[in-house]
A protein has these predicted regions:
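A generic "folded-domain core" signal
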Residues: 29-176
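N-terminal signal peptide c-region/cleavage motif recognized by signal peptidases
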Residues: 23-27
């Protein structure tokens, strides 16, 4: 991705916290979102905040394990033109991640690590890896996220990728 700040910098971490808060608020106040479209199992939306326009494609899991969990899991690809950020892949599993365990995305034989966990969200630090996972998401039908709660309990979120490419393209177009 294009970024003026390294993803692991303190300034980037502060921005991510602000983005998390802003995203939580905007989801709670859905009238602030502009829906760009629903594409099978994916949605594309945009929102304006004090730093400018943010666009993202997102989906919810089609299956979760353990089954009884009422988590607010989501998979996102975001675009923030004011910050020169494109193709930012992130997840939330609805709980604070255990930093001792890897957060992995698996699709077929391809594996990708979300190596920047922060509270309930996690990001991929490498723009090259983000490009690889997006390329895989455009071709594949499923993506499985495996992560661990603070207690050590493993969770699995299974995402359908049906509609991803169209949602991705709509979000990207809206923010370019």
């Amino acid at each position: 991705p294009s970024s003026t700040l390294p993803r692991s910098s303190a300034a980037s971490d502060v921005y991510k916290r602000q983005l998390l808060l802003m995203f939580s608020i905007t989801l709670a106040q859905s009238e602030d979102l502009t829906k760009l479209g629903t594409f099978k199992d994916w949605n594309a939306v945009s929102v304006f905040n004090e730093t400018g326009k943010i666009c993202f494609a997102y989906s919810v899991p089609v299956r979760q394990s353990p089954k009884a969990s009422n988590r607010e899991a989501r998979l996102f690809v975001s675009f923030r033109p004011e910050d020169k950020i494109t193709d930012e892949v992130s997840i939330t599993s609805g709980y604070d991640f255990n930093p001792q365990n890897a957060i992995l995305a698996t699709s077929g034989k391809s594996k990708f690590e979300f190596d920047l966990p922060q509270n309930k969200f996690a990001w991929i630090s490498s723009g090259k890896t983000e490009q690889k996972i997006i390329k895989r998401m455009k071709k594949a039908s499923r993506l499985m996220i495996t992560a661990y709660k603070q207690s050590g309990t493993q969770t699995t979120d299974d995402y359908s990728l049906m509609g991803f490419t169209k949602a991705y393209n709509a979000a990207k177009k809206s923010c370019t």
